């Protein structure tokens, strides 16, 4: 099922853990609508701006999958409102900065990105059609969350330190 021009339901529900453990990771109709919103409101604008394919690392997660991976059942992933992704050749911090300044989102988390490796980690972003989006921006280093994104120096569109 095509969710938007460049994104399919299959890539938003794919999970190696679900496959390995025989977990049904099929979203309901409301979850699919939320996934469509994430695609149209966030992923398509990001793809258009960077003009590169996006690799989804985690999209929808059923309650059973959340339990299997130790994620909260209240996660926005469990409602189809959140996605984790990367763009090959684009530092994740650059993607996060662009999202923070250019699209409507509920929560944006730069996860496991280190100053000495701006391409490391991944971007988590969510969208909530039902209410006002919080525009919450966090950085997670694997131990704790900090408000905002790390300060980085840029030159010619590249992170320099």
Regions found by a protein language model. Name each.
Residues 73-93:
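Acidic, His- and aromatic-enriched active-site or binding-groove loops in soluble protein domains
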Residues 44-70:
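Extended, low-complexity, intrinsically disordered C-terminal regulatory tails
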Residues 87-161:
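Catalytic cores and adjacent binding grooves of peptidoglycan-active enzymes
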């Amino acid at each position: 099922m095509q969710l938007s021009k460049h994104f399919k339901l299959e890539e938003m529900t794919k999970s190696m853990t679900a496959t390995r453990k025989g977990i049904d990771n099929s979203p309901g109709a409301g979850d699919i609508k939320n996934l469509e919103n994430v695609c149209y409101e966030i992923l398509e604008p990001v793809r258009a701006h960077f003009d590169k394919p996006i690799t989804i690392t985690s999209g929808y997660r059923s309650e059973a999958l959340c339990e299997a991976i130790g994620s909260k059942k209240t996660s926005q992933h469990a409602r189809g409102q959140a996605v984790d992704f990367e763009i090959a050749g684009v530092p994740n911090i650059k993607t996060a900065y662009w999202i923070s300044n250019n699209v409507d989102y509920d929560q944006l988390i730069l996860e496991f990105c280190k100053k000495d490796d701006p391409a490391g980690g991944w971007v988590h972003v969510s969208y909530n059609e039902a209410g006002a989006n919080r525009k919450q921006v966090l950085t997670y280093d694997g131990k704790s969350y900090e408000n905002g994104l790390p300060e980085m120096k840029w030159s010619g569109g590249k992170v320099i330190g």
